Amino acid sequence: MAEQPADKKSTFKKLGARHKARRRAVDLLFEAEARDVDAADLLTERADLATRDQSVAPLHAYTRTLVEGVADELERVDGTIESYLQDWTLSRLPAVDRAILRVAVWELFHATDVPPVVAVDEAVELAKELSTDDSPSFVNGVLGQVVLVAPQVRAAAAATRAPRQEPEA
């Protein structure tokens, strides 16, 4: 058997279902931005297409969770990303990097079943697969700052979701 090149874009490790779901979410967010359509609407369109056309793979539940989550929190997610960009604006980033960062930031803030290190590592892997040579270190740098505030954001979100205890009389 011939030896495969050890190039950075051709990793032969087995990709898990969550990695594939994240990649699909990045693809959908990228497409929604390129077509200037709402990501949640595109998600619905793709789900409908998958039910009508068997050649189109159905969407993984986690892909739906990510795209819906990012779409619902887009302003907050983008604001967070922008606050950690040094000498850059969100609009100057490659569109694929924006999509990768949006997925990762949403996961850091809302996916309590995903350890922060996993969210960052997955984003860096996606940047290696899908973007420029400089993108993995850039994505890692931005997310390295976001990860520092993620526990407070998660705690605040949990506190607002928790049922309030009425004082006993």
From Swiss-Prot:
Per UniProt, what is one GO molecular function of this protein? RNA binding
Positions in coiled-coil regions: none
Concerning PANTHER family, the annotation shows: ANTITERMINATION NUSB DOMAIN-CONTAINING PROTEIN, N UTILIZATION SUBSTANCE PROTEIN B-RELATED
Question: What biological process terms from GO does the record include?
Answer: DNA-templated transcription termination; transcription antitermination
Q: Is Transcription regulation found in the keyword set?
A: yes
**UniProt GO cellular component terms:** cytosol
InterPro entries, per database record: NusB-like_sf, NusB_fam, NusB_RsmB_TIM44
Is Plastid one of the keywords?
Answer: no
Q: Which family does it belong to?
A: Belongs to the NusB family.
For this protein, the record's HAMAP family field holds:
NusB
Q: What is this protein called?
A: Transcription antitermination protein NusB
Going by the UniProt record, its keywords in alphabetical order are: RNA-binding, Transcription, Transcription antitermination, Transcription regulation
Extract the CDD domains matched here: Terminator_NusB
Any idea what job this protein has? Answer: Involved in transcription antitermination. Required for transcription of ribosomal RNA (rRNA) genes. Binds specifically to the boxA antiterminator sequence of the ribosomal RNA (rrn) operons.
